[in-house]
Amino acid sequence: ARIDDVVNYEVEGDFKRAQDVYRNFKNSFRSNGAHNRASYFSISESKMSRKMMGQEKNYGIWSLLYFYEIISGYGESPLRVFMTTVTAILIFSAIFASMPEGLQNNVTGEDISTTDYLYYSVVTFTTLGYGDIVPVGPLAKMLSITEALSGVFLMSLLVVTLSRRIIT
């Protein structure tokens, strides 16, 4: 197969054949130690999977694959995962800051400052949970749980994408 064939398959909407060609290129480059090129074709192969899901009107899987592309470049970009992690921490911090009485300082009883919101978000995201600042009310507790689960997922994904870069 040639790269021209892939372009023709994509233009014609034959995403399965394009995916097969991308997979062959990926495997060929990987077996020859050209890991950056293999990564490119791995991403292209995954994009064809997503396009096939769109063709088949399987929008649930299409959405998951699109989300996976955005946050990690289909598992090929540790930088994307890191940027998603930073963005998530900042968004959760802003959400907590916008909630009146959302957090409480258990140690000093003082008002929560802007840096405290960021600190709480990092501690919750990384699931350290020192207990000095705690969520108050059901909404703040649910947001904390959501952030902690997001943290576990994204930290695991970061380890996987970094490992793929180091091992290959």
Segments predicted by a language model, with ranges:
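Short secondary-structure junctions and interdomain/linker hinges
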Residues: 32, 36, 70-78, 89, ...
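Residue-level hotspots within the lipid-embedded alpha helices of multi-pass solute transporters
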Residues: 28, 85, 149-152
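N-terminal leader/targeting and pre-domain segments
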Residues: 1-62
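Outer-pore turret/helix-boundary of cation channels
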Residues: 83-119, 139
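Pore domain of cation channels
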Residues: 108-168
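Hydrophobic, well-ordered secondary-structure elements that form the walls
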Residues: 38, 95, 162
